[in-house]
Amino acid sequence: MDKVFPSTQESSLSLTDIKKENGLIVIFSCNTCPFVVGTEDFPGWENQYNPLYNMALKANIGFVLINSNEGKRAGVDSFEEMKSHAKKMSYQMPYLMDENSELANAMEAKTTPHVFFFDKNNKLICAGSIDNIWDNKRKKDEQYLSMAIQSVLNGKKVKPNFTAAKGCSIKRVSK
């Protein structure tokens, strides 16, 4: 958690810099995935980032977006494009560049978006999707991440704590 990453807001930050008293939420994201930015038929998840960030702040939980799309770094996921996208979307939270997809590989992140929620002791307590709006067969809407934040705030166990991550694959550099 001490590795330093280039940030669209500051020169560089580590996950330790961002973590707060009650934990840390890491969301692997990017600038182009339809699951992140949306389509005509699907709203995408990035419009939820700022409200979730504010909810996490109130619960004293750190919140960060990570772009690990090293395979697209020369184009749509370049650091300059990340800065432009963060400004366009008015991101309030840090948006970090994961060079060579090192963090994504270490955390076994698969998709954008992919959520990892760590408690105050750095234990993974929740991972997967932000919610279930992608599932056309859902019986009811479930806001997984906001429910997890609320559970931590209320001193309760996070349920469900592991859900399927839906999104675009992280574009790693082939070796």
List the model feature ranges, each with a label.
Residues 37-88, 102-103:
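Structural microenvironment flanking redox-active thiols in thiol-disulfide oxidoreductases
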Residues 117-175:
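Thiol-/selenol-based redox modules, centered on thioredoxin-like
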